[in-house]
Amino acid sequence: MDIKIKDFEGPLDLLLHLVSKYQMDIYDVPITEVIEQYLAYVATLQAMRLEVAGEYMVMASQLMLIKSRKLLPKVVDDADLEEDLEHDLLSQIVEYRKFKLLGEKMAEQHEERALYYSKPKIELVYEDAELVHDRSAIDLFLAFSGLLAKKREEFRHSHTTIVKDEYKIEDMMDVVLERCKSQKKLALQELFTETKDMNEVITLFLATLELVKVQEIQLFQEENFGSIYLIRK
């Protein structure tokens, strides 16, 4: 089964999504938390052997530099450089948001003008105006990155010898649906409590993503950064 994760338009689009979850001025967001979420997203993609575009890796390197400088003891010159790097990053996100909103407005105006003409509408070629992403799936992906790290640590300290099985996404989809059927809402972390190895964890997650994609289950989150629940439709 070929599962494709919808990409953002680029690293700035992903960062904009992450900072927007804080619902505050971009310059006031806890930048270290945002950086950790971004790096966790990229690391999870790599752990699942999914392709990561080069531009995301370049941004990851820049973010790791900012994060490392924030963790080091403060030196006057370095502190100034750290503030400059952080301010430059946030300014890029602010500018990108302006550009994105402008693109969306242009797309809306194009749609409105098309209503007044009888001839077929010409599609507006403006990639940044699209920006249609499956945010629910991305939020699920970000939540999974934390679970993945915990399960990896759990298996590392486990002394149980386990024979690795071959897991199929189709079979795991049935498992997820059955679990959701037996409970009104299923917390994401509960889905992975009985997993035996990383192959099972990853296959189970891919099955969950596919069920979201085909709209057999929906995701529910009471608040930003809160627990994610699965509900069968």
Swiss-Prot record:
Subcellular localization, as worded in the UniProt entry: Cytoplasm
Biological function:
Participates in chromosomal partition during cell division. May act via the formation of a condensin-like complex containing Smc and ScpB that pull DNA away from mid-cell into both cell halves.
The subunit field of the Swiss-Prot or TrEMBL record says:
Component of a cohesin-like complex composed of ScpA, ScpB and the Smc homodimer, in which ScpA and ScpB bind to the head domain of Smc. The presence of the three proteins is required for the association of the complex with DNA.
Give the protein's recorded name: Segregation and condensation protein A
Family annotation (InterPro entries): ScpA, ScpA-like_C
In the UniProt record, the gene name given for this protein reads scpA
Q: Report the sequence similarity comment from the record.
A: Belongs to the ScpA family.
NCBIfam families (alphabetical): PRK00104.1-2 (NF000993)
